Curated annotation (Swiss-Prot):
Keywords: Nickel, Periplasm, Signal, Transport. It is found in: Periplasm. GO terms for biological process: negative chemotaxis; nickel cation import across plasma membrane; nickel cation transport; peptide transport. One of its GO terms (molecular function) is transition metal ion binding. This is Nickel-binding periplasmic protein. Residues 1-22 form the signal peptide. SUPFAM superfamilies: Periplasmic binding protein-like II (SSF53850). The keyword Transport applies. PANTHER family: NICKEL-BINDING PERIPLASMIC PROTEIN, PERIPLASMIC BINDING COMPONENT OF ABC TRANSPORTER.
Length: 524
């Protein structure tokens, strides 16, 4: 699901990044921590979101200001009640194998996605679509249950509502795999070798503006230090990613070197811990509140993140739509944390440094992706901070798939988590809280008002009334904040390190995409 996404790009932008080496004016070599996967446009891990977006395209394209522009659809209209939408498709688009992209092909893709509707239930649009049909070669009609306000934005997402040539379905479906990743986008996956590389070439028959680059090779390089060394020795010309891009002390050093060009974007998403409200001892509000006061976030960011990110006080940054609510932050205050625990009956026995209640120690597991050195470093700092208030935090480092399984089934006390950035936040991120697709559903299971929160999420996605929408978002986000379900840590920015001759490197409006088509290598 999106988690894969997030941890895929966001452990793939977060757990790595990408590296680019200008082998020639029209060829670059990049690096990624894992292979890009089979590139099924309608499924999740191990498919890498940035690569899905290179090959497959949406009806409408998301922009940095939150709007959408025509893409495979050149125009659209909707009924007065907002439930029936008619899209007029471009008539000059073909899949990279020469098959025509038309309304029939688009409708078949929607059918394939919705035949696997339960898999996509985290995204409300998958639940809202009632019917999709081709009215003609160029007219596509989509009927919804209600006037769903994020409809166009969710059509623009990297997955699942993008289009593969119907000839590449397996047994008329995509839920069990595809034959080959044939899309309409500017890139074609030419070759993959497991644990070694993936090669993309420019789609020479692309209907839109062709990229300047003809070939991109993604070498599989999991280690950030190896990437940094490659850049420093001149083998790599560009690195682009999030906080896992390269060792952050190295980024800080590169930033001081006039021979290198470095960039930090505006904050794009939040890294936090999800606290399990249904599992002792984090089922107690006082414990969750105390843990929020226990972590010295500024020190953590200065030491583990080398000051490259911003302290997070709330689930979403105030810059996120509907999230600038003035919620009171739980700023670092270990004495207040201790007082909360004392009042809740968690006392410190003589001669011990771990609190107990009814003979049980205040012991909490913190789960993280074991191969992510940055998460490990952050976990160790959090562990030390929480020990200062008498909490014994045991660290559970496991492979990525195991951590996501823990998120889905609730086998965690605390677990690293993050929001998804534009265009998912806040609406799609909140929508997913209603199903066990990510850590949020399980983390909230112990809340008495969980049914109300879920009900209000459904209402906020369907209402026409902007005043009601604002009020619902305020209530949902305030409840989650007051219940201390999350321990926000930092607001994450995208990072770029490049040779100055590449100029200013653009950021994609969708955080999980990489704008390779806008990169124009320049000869020295």
């Amino acid at each position: 699901m999106l988690s894969t996404l997030r941890r895929t790009l966001f452990a793939l932008l977060a757990c790595a990044s990408f590296i680019v080496h200008a082998a020639a004016p029209d060829e670059i070599t990049t690096a990624w921590p894992v292979n890009v996967g089979p590139l099924n446009p309608h499924l999740y891990t191990p498919n890498q979101m940035f690569a899905q977006s290179m090959v497959y395209e949406p009806l409408v394209k998301y922009q940095a200001d939150g709007s959408v522009i025509p893409w495979l659809a050149k125009s659209w209209t909707h009924s007065e009640d907002g439930k029936t939408w008619t899209f007029t498709l471009r008539d000059d688009v073909k899949f990279s194998n020469g098959e025509p992209f038309d309304a029939e092909a688009a409708a078949e893709n929607f059918r394939a996605v919705l035949d696997n509707r339960q898999r996509h239930a985290w995204l409300e649009l998958a639940n809202q679509i009632v019917d999709v049909k081709a009215l003609s070669k160029t007219e596509l009609q989509i009927t919804l249950k209600s006037a769903y306000y994020p409809f166009l934005q969710e059509l623009a997402l990297p997955r699942p509502f993008r289009f593969i040539a119907p000839s590449q379905f397996k047994n008329h479906e995509t839920m069990n795999g595809i034959k080959a990743p044939i899309g309409t986008g500017p890139w074609i996956l030419q070759e993959s070798k497991l644990n070694q590389y993936d090669v993309f070439v420019r789609n020479e028959n692309y209907w839109g503006e062709k990229p300047a680059i003809k070939k991109i090779t993604f070498n599989v390089i999991p280690d950030p230090t190896t990437r940094a060394v490659a850049f420093e020795t001149g083998d790599i010309d560009l690195l682009y990613g999030n906080e896992g891009l390269l060792p952050l002390d190295t980024f800080a050093r590169f930033s001081q070197n006039p021979a290198y060009h470095t960039q930090l974007s505006q904050p794009i998403e939040t890294v936090m811990l999800a606290l399990n409200t249904a599992k002792a001892p984090t089922n107690e509000l006082a414990v969750r509140e105390a843990l929020n006061y226990a972590v010295n976030k500024k020190s953590l960011i200065d030491n583990a993140l080398y000051g490259t990110q911003q302290v997070a006080d709330t689930l979403f940054a105030p810059s996120v739509p509907y999230a600038n609510l003035g919620l009171k932050p739980s700023q670092y205050d270990p004495q207040k944390a201790k007082a909360l625990l004392e009042k809740a009956g968690w006392t410190l026995p003589a001669g011990k440094d771990i609190r107990e209640k009814n003979g049980q120690p205040l012991r909490i597991e913190l789960s993280f992706i074991g191969t992510d050195a940055l998460s490990k470093s952050m976990a160790e700092i959090i562990q030390a901070d929480m020990r200062q208030i008498g909490a014994d935090v045991s660290l559970i480092g496991e492979e990525e798939s195991s951590i996501y399984a823990r998120q889905r089934d609730g086998r965690f006390g605390m677990i690293f988590h993050r929001t998804w950035g534009a265009p998912y936040d806040p609406h799609a991120f909140l929508s997913s809280m209603r199903v066990p697709s990510h850590a949020d559903f399980q983390a909230q299971q112990g809340l008495a008002d969980k049914p109300l929160i879920d009900k209000e999420i459904g209402e906020v996605l369907a209402t026409h009334d902007e005043t009601q929408r604002q009020a619902l978002y305020r209530d949902i986000l305030t409840r989650l904040h007051d219940e201390a379900v999350y321990l926000p840590i930092s607001y994450i920015s995208m990072m770029v390190v490049s040779k100055p001759e590449l100029g200013n490197i653009p950021y994609a409006p969708i955080a999980t995409e990489i704008p390779f088509e806008q990169i124009k290598p320049v000869k020295p």
